Amino acid sequence: MATLSLTVNSGDPPLGALLAVEHVKDDVSISVEEGKENILHVSENVIFTDVNSILRYLARVATTAGLYGSNLMEHTEIDHWLEFSATKLSSCDSFTSTINELNHCLSLRTYLVGNSLSLADLCVWATLKGNAAWQEQLKQKKAPVHVKRWFGFLEAQQAFQSVGTKWDVSTTKARVAPEKKQDVGKFVELPGAEMGKVTVRFPPEASGYLHIGHAKAALLNQHYQVNFKGKLIMRFDDTNPEKEKEDFEKVILEDVAMLHIKPDQFTYTSDHFETIMKYAEKLIQEGKAYVDDTPAEQMKAEREQRIDSKHRKNPIEKNLQMWEEMKKGSQFGQSCCLRAKIDMSSNNGCMRDPTLYRCKIQPHPRTGNKYNVYPTYDFACPIVDSIEGVTHALRTTEYHDRDEQFYWIIEALGIRKPYIWEYSRLNLNNTVLSKRKLTWFVNEGLVDGWDDPRFPTVRGVLRRGMTVEGLKQFIAAQGSSRSVVNMEWDKIWAFNKKVIDPVAPRYVALLKKEVIPVNVPEAQEEMKEVAKHPKNPEVGLKPVWYSPKVFIEGADAETFSEGEMVTFINWGNLNITKIHKNADGKIISLDAKLNLENKDYKKTTKVTWLAETTHALPIPVICVTYEHLITKPVLGKDEDFKQYVNKNSKHEELMLGDPCLKDLKKGDIIQLQRRGFFICDQPYEPVSPYSCKEAPCVLIYIPDGHTKEMPTSGSKEKTKVEATKNETSAPFKERPTPSLNNNCTTSEDSLVLYNRVAVQGDVVRELKAKKAPKEDVDAAVKQLLSLKAEYKEKTGQEYKPGNPPAEIGQNISSNSSASILESKSLYDEVAAQGEVVRKLKAEKSPKAKINEAVECLLSLKAQYKEKTGKEYIPGQPPLSQSSDSSPTRNSEPAGLETPEAKVLFDKVASQGEVVRKLKTEKAPKDQVDIAVQELLQLKAQYKSLIGVEYKPVSATGAEDKDKKKKEKENKSEKQNKPQKQNDGQRKDPSKNQGGGLSSSGAGEGQGPKKQTRLGLEAKKEENLADWYSQVITKSEMIEYHDISGCYILRPWAYAIWEAIKDFFDAEIKKLGVENCYFPMFVSQSALEKEKTHVADFAPEVAWVTRSGKTELAEPIAIRPTSETVMYPAYAKWVQSHRDLPIKLNQWCNVVRWEFKHPQPFLRTREFLWQEGHSAFATMEEAAEEVLQILDLYAQVYEELLAIPVVKGRKTEKEKFAGGDYTTTIEAFISASGRAIQGGTSHHLGQNFSKMFEIVFEDPKIPGEKQFAYQNSWGLTTRTIGVMTMVHGDNMGLVLPPRVACVQVVIIPCGITNALSEEDKEALIAKCNDYRRRLLSVNIRVRADLRDNYSPGWKFNHWELKGVPIRLEVGPRDMKSCQFVAVRRDTGEKLTVAENEAETKLQAILEDIQVTLFTRASEDLKTHMVVANTMEDFQKILDSGKIVQIPFCGEIDCEDWIKKTTARDQDLEPGAPSMGAKSLCIPFKPLCELQPGAKCVCGKNPAKYYTLFGRSY
C-alpha cells in the first residue's frame, strides 16, 4: 500500500487523528507534515478532511490494531461515540449534562467500548483535551470521578504522551461563531433598579394558550431578571373563576418552559385572597369605597356621562351591610359590586369609580366555594405586586390609563409602591391575538387546534418551524420600546432563518405529477456520500444514489435545449443529447451523456434530481404551505375580523422525496433544495400490515422572510453570467492597437498571448472572490501559469500586468519616438522635482530651501507646457498619436529594451515592493532606511544606464479589473454611504479615461503625491447602485442623515426642485388652483375614516406617541398624504354648489416609513412634493382636470428634465387605494431595465366626499343632497433621481439646461507663475465680464476663480456636477478675442468668437436640451416593445426592456404574472429578483388590440394592451 500523507494545521491540530496515527504506524506507512489544513491524502483523487472520517479510514486499513471494535455491535457503539464527541461534547450549552452522562457510562468500564482501546476513546479523549470547561474542572478538582480516572489512565500511556509532547493543543471553548453585533432592540434601564434587588413578574391568566404577545412580556421580564441578577415571579392571575381552567395552567407552564424561561417563584393571586379582602373592607370603613347595585349597562352609561351613582353617598354602615350580602352570595348580593370612590368627573375613564370586587357564586379551581366575592385584576394586581416584593411592574402601553388607578389604590391602602414600566404591545399583521377571537377559529373548525401552524400561539409558530432561539431573537430585537407598530410576519421569519439556515440539512423533493425521466446509459448504479450542508460539514453526510435513469421536474426540462450542458447538483455536468416530446409537444423524456470531467458550473442551469434504483426508492412526501389567517393586514377598531377570514389558507402538494427523508423525526428542520425550509410534522411510516399502505412524510413550509415567492424550477443563470464574462474579457479583446509594419506578426501573436494571460488572470480573481471550490481555483491557476510560461518562452520576458509586449512600440516611426522621448524626459524631470519639494516639506526644511525648490519646479512646468502645449498633470505622461489609441502600451525610450535595462528595471521594481512591504508591516526604522537606500542606489544606476529617471509602469486595463469586488447591493443603507473625500488634484478623465488615478505602481518607493478620488469609482453599466450613490454625493446633491431613509437636499439638488416648482406653480395657477398649507399631523380617527385608503398606507404611517417624557393620550400620525387632513375642512366650506369648485395645492413634505432598502430621491421615508386636491360639482369637470394635470406632469419631464414618458391609466391592482381611477406618467431607466412612476393624477370619484360628508344641494333637484366629485394629484422629488439615472454617465451628473442651477461655468486657464500680474488680472476681469454679459441675457452662470485648484481639477469638478457648458478662457484666447465652450453632454469643444458669446451659448444650451431628450427618446423607443405571448414577454423582460402585452385586467392574473416573472437571486445570481408589474394602460399603445385577442395568461379575453415591466 502507498504511503499516506496527513497534513496538520499546527494552529488547530486534529488530536484524534494524530492519536490514531500513533496506534497504526506499525501497520500503515503514513507521513505527518505541517500545513494550512487538516487533510489525509490517500491518493490523487481521494482525500479526507473530516477528523472522524480520517479516524474511520485509518482504523479500517489497520485492522490488526483493532481500533474499530471486533464485531458489529462494537462498531455501532464506536460510531455513536464519534458522533457524541463531535456534537454534544463540543457544545458549551450542554457540557455539564454531557460530562455527567459520560461519567455514568464509564462507572464500570476501563474503556468506552469493549475491553481494549478504540476510536471511541481516542476521539472523546481528544475532544476533552482541547475543552476549556473540562480543563477548568480538572484545575478546580471538580471533575466527575470516573471520567477523571479514565482520562488520567489514557494520558499516562506512551502514545498519548508522545502526541501531547509534539503538538501544542490550546484549550478552547466549544466552537463559537464569529462575534458580530446582534440585531437586538434597545432595553431601557429600569429607573431606581439596583443590582440583585430587582423583582419582576409575569402574570398570565390561565384561560388560554400563550401567544407571541405573551412571549414578549415573559422575555422582557426575563431580560431584566438576568441583567440585574434579580428575581422573576410567575404568577397566575386567577381572579375570575369563570375563566380560570386548571388545564390551561399546565399548558402555560409548558409554553414558558419552551421559551427557556426559569422563574424563581410560582404564585397565584388566590394565595392572597384573604389579604385582598381585608384591604377592600379597609377602603369601605375609610369611606373610600362603596357597594353599588346599579345594573351594568346603566353603570356604564353613568360613567360615560360622569353621573354619580345613587349609592355613592351611602353611609359606611349601609355599605358594610351590602358587602356582607355580597360575601354570602345572596340574590341581592349577586346584583352588587364594590366600587372605589375616586373621581366621577375625571377625564380618565379608569378613575371614574372603577369596580374593585364582584360577586360570583361559581366554585374557584383552587379555593372551591370558600369565597363568593372575587377582586378585579386591577384591584388585586397592585396589592399582590406590593406584597410579593415586585420592584418593577412591566405592563404594555394599553394599560397606560389604568396606571393612575394602580397608584391610587397603593396610596389609599398605604402599602409599598412598585414602579410601573411600560412597553409596546406586539401587534402582528394578518392575524388576531385576542383569545376570544382565536377560540372562535378553534370552535368553528377553521384550524386544527391551538397549535395550528397558522396561529400566533407559541405552539403554533413552533409547529410551523419557528425555533425558540429565533423567537427569542425576534422579541429581543423589539426591546422595551414604547413605539406602537404593526409588525409584518416577514420580520419574525427572517430572524428564524438566521438560526436554521446554518444547520438545516439539504434534501431533494420533486413535484410528483411533473417528473420527467432522464436516461443516462453510461451511468453506473452506485452510491456516494455527500455533505448534507454545503457550508457546514458538521451537519454530516447523506447517501446519494446514481443510476442510468434519473428523474427531474418538468419545469426544469422545459428550459433545456439539445446539446446544452446542465449541472445536476451533487453529481456534475451532463450534456442533453436528445429531448423526446409527445404529439402535444410536451416533453416525456430526455437523453443525456455524462460530462463529469468538465468542472465549469458557472454558465450552466442547476437542477435537482432523484435516481431510480431499487436500493433506495423515493418516498411519498406531502408539502403543506400555510397562508395568513386574515386577508387584511391591519383591522380597524370596529371591523369584524370574520369578514376577512382566509378560507383557503392551506395548500398541499404531493412530492417524490429523497430516500433520506424516511429517517426524519417529528420536529426536524430541513431545506428542500430550491424550495425552501420545511419542518417534519409527520414522519414517514413504511407499509402498515393493517392498511397495506405507507404513510407519507408530511412537511410544513417554513417562511424565511422573503416578501416574494421563491421560484422552484425552470430557472436559468446563463445570461447574466455570460454577460459578466464578456465584460471581464472585453478590455483585452477590444483594445485598439496602433497600425504597424507588415512584418510584425510575431508581435501580434505576443499581444494575443498577453491578452489571454490577462483574461485568465481575471478568471482566477473572480473564482477566488466568489470563494469557488479549491479544485476549480487550482485548475484555473494551473492554466494561468501555463499561459505565463508560454508568454515568457515567446517574448523572452516575464508577463507583467499593464506592460504588453514591447516589440510593438519599436515599430513606431523614429520622428514620433524622438519627440515623445524628449517630452517624456521633461515630464520625468518635473515629477522628480515634485518629489524633491514634497520631501523637503515632509522633513520640515528651512523655508528658503523649499522656495528655491518650488521655483525650480514651476520653471520646469513652464518648459513642459511650452514643449507640449499642455499643463503638467501627474499620472499623465505625454503620449504619441498612436499611443493615444492604446493606453496600455509603453512609451519608454528604446534603451529600456536592452537586456541589462530590463534586469535593472526588474530589480528596482522588486526593491520597491520590499520597501512597501516593510512599511506595511511597520518594520523597525533602521531596517526600512537600509531598504530605501538600496532602492535609491538602484534608481541612480538605472538613470545612468538609460538616461532617464526610473518610472514605474502605470497599469491600466487588467489591473483596473483587480479593484475591490462590488459589495452586495442589498446591504444596509448606512454601509452604502460614501466617505467624504478631500479635494485635491486629479487628472481630467475626459482626456484619459480608464487610466489609474496616480502614476505610482510596482517598484515606486515614494511615488507622486496621492491623487484625491474626485471622480466616480463605479461605472454605471457595471454597478448601478454604487454609481448612483457616488453621483448624488460627489455632485453635492445629497448629504446622508443619521436617520435611515432621510436625506439632506443640498442647494444643487434643491435648485432643480425649485425649477420644477416655478414652472408647475405658474401653470396650475392658470387653471385656477390656489396654494395653501394644512397641518402635518393627523388624528387616528381621521386617518381610519377611509378604510381602503388607510389599509394601503398603514404599514408606512409614522406615529408620534410622546411629548417630552409624557405619553400622549392618543397617538398622532404624521401625514403619509393629506386627504384625511384636508377633507374635513372641505366638508365645512362646501354648503352649496356655488362653493365649488375648490382647487387647492400645497408644497410640503410627507413621511412614509418604507421598510424596503431606501434610495435617495427614489425611495425615501421623507420627501418633498406638491399635492393638489380639488372638488367639483360634476364628474365631467373632475375628469377634465385629471388629464390637464397629467399633461403638465408630462411637460415637467419632457420639457424641463428632457425625459420621455408614457401616459396612461393604472390597472385596478395598481390604482390609488380609495380612488375610482388613476392616471400616470411612466419613465424608463435603461441602465437597470426598470421603469419608474413619474407622477400620478387620481380621480377619487365620490368615495372620499361620502366618507367626509362633502355635500351640497343639487341645483337641479332642490332639497336633494349631492356628493362632490374629487381629484388628487402629486409630483415628488423622485423626479431628481429619475433625471440622474436617465442622463448621468461615468463622469457624473448631466443636467438638462432648463433645470440646471448653473448653466455655464467660466474657468480661467493658463494662470502660471510665468504669467505677469497684469495679464492675470486682465484674465480674471475678462471672466467677470463674460459672467456679467451672460447674466444680462438670463443665463445662469458662475465663474470659478478659486486659485487653490488647477484648471484640470475644476474641469473634473464641474463635469461631475453636470454643468451643461464649460467656458474656458486663457491669455491666448483673450488675444484672439475668442473662448472655448465645452459641452457636458457630448464632450464636444467649440471655439466661439467673443462678440457672439450670448447668442451662441443660448443656442448651444437649447441644442443640449434637445439632444438629451432625443437620446432618451431613442432609448425608450428601443426598450419598449410589444409581446403577444407569455414566452416572448419573459424573454424580452429578461433582456431589460418594458413590454406592452394583451391583458385582461384581472388582479389575480396580474399577481400570477408578477409571480411567474420573479427570479430568485439564490438560484440566479445577478438576476433581477422582482417580478414584472403593470405600469399603465397606455393612452397610445404601440399597436391596436385585435378582435378575439387573448390575455397572455391564456384564460381570459384581452381588454387592452398594458405596459408591464420591472419597476422601482
Swiss-Prot record:
Question: Which residues lie in Low complexity bias regions?
Answer: 878-887
The family line of this record is:
In the N-terminal section; belongs to the class-I aminoacyl-tRNA synthetase family. Glutamate--tRNA ligase type 2 subfamily. In the C-terminal section; belongs to the class-II aminoacyl-tRNA synthetase family.
Q: Which residues carry this modification: Phosphoserine?
A: 434, 747, 882, 885-886, 891, 998-1000, 1350
Q: Where is the composition biased (Basic and acidic residues)?
A: 709-725, 958-976
Q: What is this protein called?
A: Bifunctional glutamate/proline--tRNA ligase
Protein localization = Cytoplasm, Cytosol; Membrane
Q: Where is this motif: 'HIGH' region?
A: 204-214
Domain annotation WHEP-TRS: ranges: 749-805, 822-878, 900-956
Which portions of the chain have biased composition (kind: Gly residues)?
993-1006
Q: Which gene encodes it?
A: EPRS1
Q: Which sequence positions carry the modification called Phosphotyrosine?
A: 872
Q: Which residues bind L-proline?
A: 1121-1123, 1152, 1242
